[in-house]
Amino acid sequence: MLGFAGCNDDENKDNIPPTLREYEAPVFMYGKTREEVKASVPYAYSGASETSLYFEGKGIVKEYIYIFEDDKVYSCGSILSDLYVYYLHTYLSQLYIYLEYRPGQRMYVYESEDKSLSIGLYPLNDGLAAVEYLKN
């Protein structure tokens, strides 16, 4: 995302870069079981671990992850290239209330207007970043 070939003002309505229009947040299903998530999400199932379910990404998202605690969805997230962090920060700041940057974790933190949802944007290893959604 170092630049956008062919980008002009008409393509950049609402100050959202064209590539970020391809960002689709995961369907948040707090409290749902593994079976309910598998049956409900619009993504292709790609695997599981003891604590998570993995689904193929869409658009710029490489993978969607649903994390479970006590066999219920605790959080979910999208994994994408860390090249999108700057643009995602700007984009998420338009959608949610930007709260703070946590330098030790290199994490941007946001909250929904109704304060029901917390969102974290942070880098992972190997050139990847995560956007994680948690119920407050």
Predicted feature locations:
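Short Gly/Thr-rich strand-loop-strand
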Residues: L92-E113
